[in-house]
Amino acid sequence: KRKTAVYVKEGTKTKLITDNMTGKVTEINVNLINLLLNNKYLPVICPPALSEENEIINTDNDWACAVMVGALKIQKMISLFEASGLLKKFGDESSLIKNVDKNKLDEYFIYTQGRMKKKLLGAKEAFAQGLKQLYWSDGRIKNPIIKALKGEGTIIS
């Protein structure tokens, strides 16, 4: 659903943007995804989506994934991004938090800023939708999925 306005923080000022093209995912086309999977296609799903008015809008990928978890009954999910996982100290890869209890996600907001806050909110919603295990890992490295599954990132369960 397309948002009519968005608040944006620029330095110390907060601005209201009314001509934005962002929205929030409210449902997933499960039939299309299942059609692709049943015919041995691997769908690559990205943040742009269609609004209720058939406009192309940008969406929050982490929230979209949470909605997909519920719609497709996903048990395990891997999320790759530009960090080694959840860090205690922003930018310090040596401060990686290896394991997080899904029932204690609220305790980890103190370590997040910017996009990581949205990732944590998306993770909370994904677990509320039935997710059992979430891997956060670095997508910039060689063999990122294999390394994520081997525990070279943050595992939330």
Where are the model-predicted features located?
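C-terminal catalytic "cap/lid" subdomain
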Residues: K1-S157
